[in-house]
Amino acid sequence: MIAEQDDKHARDHISFRKIWKDRDDEEPQLLEKILSRDNLKSACRRVKASGGAPGVDGMHAEEAKTWFDENGREFMVRILKGKYTPRPVLHTEVQKKGEAGVLNITVSTVPDRIIQQAIVQQIMPIYEQIFADGNYCNRPGRSAQAAGLKVLEYTQQGYTNAAIQNLSESFALENFGQLLNILRRNITDERVIQIIKRILKSGIMECDTLTACKEGILQGGTLAPLIANIYLNEFDQEFAGRGVPVVRYAGDIVLLAKSRRAAERLLETSSKYLEGSLRLRVNENSGRAICICKR
């Protein structure tokens, strides 16, 4: 079980201040790398280029460079001293283009987007080394089209059936501590873990009402998709160990099989692993076993 594997990574109840005072000696410079001026300036450029709606502070992405030039040094010092508190994400609903229904959108403030992007730039290379080959989620140079081609490649190898799972768009995670312990395997600077925790638990502002994030991972920002991807790497590695080809993109997971019966078994075992071991919510009635052979 994952919980047993992560026992050695668990931390006793330790205060936020003490973490900053007695930081890990194993990798004491990770936070400093994140906060290097070059890394932050690069993050700032990416945030500005990405655009997007303003968060709760009303600041537009186009203002990122101006804000950083005026406040960057103070921002860095505040984070280094453990005094950084992310703002709540702003929740809005946007009508889907060309179809019924709405998209739930959460938007971080520009300063929060900058530090999130700075973290991503430093930890992404760590996880690129351990992500599974069938993982096409939010990775450089990978796309939905490439994921589809990978599935096609497997069909040509005789994997003509598949079990398909779809995860809740809110990434409703019931065991947040388990996620933090998974992060600690590769991020040994506890200060960075605590910053990530604060970002993911910053709360949601909707109609001038602040709601605490009691479970799940807030998806308003650049960091959350990577964190969700890291967590789901547990699934990829588990089923790779069972000899099951897996292709994953966005919230969709495709497990390949050579027969309908095998696909149905995979549908059952993958549901148990997602909901039991990883404690994630699978979209109700979304799982299915299908034939993907050419007709």
Residue ranges and their predicted role:
Residues 78-93, 130-134, 138-139, 145-294:
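Conserved polymerase palm-domain catalytic core
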Residues 1-69, 73:
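Non-catalytic, polymerase-adjacent accessory regions of viral genome-replication enzymes
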Residues 86-108, 112:
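Conserved beta-strand/loop block within the catalytic cores
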Residues 105-123, 127-129:
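Hydrophobic alpha-helical hairpins/lids featuring a short glycine-rich hinge
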Residues 43-47, 118, 195-200:
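Short alpha-helical scaffolding segments that buttress acidic/His motifs in well-ordered protein cores
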